[in-house]
Structure formats: C-alpha cells, structure tokens
C-alpha cells in the first residue's frame, strides 16, 4: 500500500482542501465552485510537481483537468452571479447552511477534498510511476476531451433554453436524446481519466484509490440525476 501514498499525494489533498474551503462561505460551494476549481488547481499542481518528467500525453491529461475545472467553475460562477431564476430556485430548494453545525461542514469539506484528490489520481500515478505517454494515455485523453465537449454543449443548450422559459425542463438538443446529458458528459470524462491510468496502476493500493474516485463521482452523478 506504500506506493499508493507517496508524499506528493498529500500535496494534492492539501490543495483540494484549500481550494474547496470556499464552501465555508456558502456550503453548497463545497460541491460546486469548490469542485470545479479544485480539479483545475490539481491539474496545475501536477504540471508543477512533475515538470521535469512531463511528456506530450501527460501534459495533455493535466491540461484537460485545467480546462474541465475552469469551464465548470466558470459556468457555475456565472450562473450564481447572473441567473436570477437559478438563485430563486436555490433559495427554495437548498438551505443556506447558516444553521449547519461547524463539525458537519468540516466533514463535508474533508470528504469532498478526498473525493477530488482520488478523481485525478490515475493521472497522478501515471506521472509518479514514471510511465510517460502511451496509447492508453491518448485514448483516455480522447475520451476525456469528448466528455468535456459533450458536457459543455449540454450546459450551453440548457442555459439557452432556460433564457426562453426558466420554469420548463430543458428537452431540446442533447436533452432530447438523454435526460441529463451534462451528467453523462461528466461520467464520460471521468471514465477517460480511469482509462488513462488503467495500464500503469501498480498494486492494490493504487487500484483502490483510483476506483474510490471513479465510483464516487459516478455515484454522485447518478444520485444527482435521480433527483431531477
């Protein structure tokens, strides 16, 4: 299990903790803004930590994390600031967290940071294990890029539809094909991440960490889709 927890992995966890701490301002930000910007931050951090051993494929994988995180974080931030309909809905559906015990907030914070760390761990292990770039890395990156584009189009189509009728569930574009294409895009993206590191994970510890992150985010996506 030792090779699953090199010292650098704790830097990932600490970074996710620092960035997602924005949730103490508004607790839902632990899983929204804190999520998106944590993934972007972890992508940047891996580029820095392994700057002397990067290859084309590993740079691409890290940059996809950055693109994913900034796109998601930026989209959510814009919605928070500009969408009156969204803010009105959130006031009725989600509590502001002011009465939530501090200990509960801390538990959510730590759990989220751990999840975000394990989500990117397949790429981290590829870098840590010195595996460089191979076919698996490029296939994984391709799947990630497809998921990112798919999710981006879905969010754009939903925003466009909500401007016309804020109260109507979006059923145009990709939403004609699948009920929650934005969530599907998320799942495709993280499947690509797992694929990118599947052939370089060594030992039970690395596999457990990678599967915890993958299963965790897939569970979150299915849970979110069921609530709609």
Protein language model features and the residues they cover:
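Hydrophobic transmembrane alpha-helices
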Residues: 3-16, 20, 38-70, 119-157, ...
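Hydrophobic alpha-helical segments of membrane proteins, primarily the transmembrane helices
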Residues: 26-29, 33, 62, 106, ...
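Juxtamembrane helix-capping/reentrant segments at transmembrane boundaries
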Residues: 30-40, 85-107, 168-175
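A general boundary/transition motif marking the beginning of the first structured unit of a protein
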Residues: 78-82, 106, 220, 224
């Amino acid at each position: 299990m030792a090779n699953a927890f090199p010292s650098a992995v704790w830097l990932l966890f600490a970074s996710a903790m620092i960035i997602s701490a924005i949730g103490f301002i508004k607790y839902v930000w632990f899983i929204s803004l804190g999520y998106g910007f944590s993934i972007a931050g972890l992508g940047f951090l891996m580029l820095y930590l392994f700057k002397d051993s990067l290859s084309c494929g590993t740079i691409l994988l890290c940059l996809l994390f950055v693109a994913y995180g900034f796109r998601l974080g930026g989209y959510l931030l814009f919605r928070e600031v500009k969408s009156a309909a969204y803010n009105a809905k959130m006031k009725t559906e989600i509590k502001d967290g002011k009465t939530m015990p501090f200990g509960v907030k801390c538990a959510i914070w730590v759990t989220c940071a751990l999840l975000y760390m394990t989500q990117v761990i397949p790429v981290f292990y590829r870098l840590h294990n010195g595996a460089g770039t191979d076919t698996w890395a490029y296939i994984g990156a391709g799947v990630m890029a497809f998921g990112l584009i798919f999710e981006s189009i879905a969010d754009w189509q939903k925003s466009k539809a909500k401007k016309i009728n804020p109260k109507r569930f979006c059923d145009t574009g990709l939403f004609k094909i699948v009920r929650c294409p934005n969530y599907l895009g998320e799942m495709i993206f993280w499947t690509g991440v797992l694929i990118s590191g599947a052939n370089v994970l060594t030992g039970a510890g690395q596999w457990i960490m990678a599967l915890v992150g993958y299963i965790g985010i897939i569970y979150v996506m299915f849970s979110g889709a069921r609530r709609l």
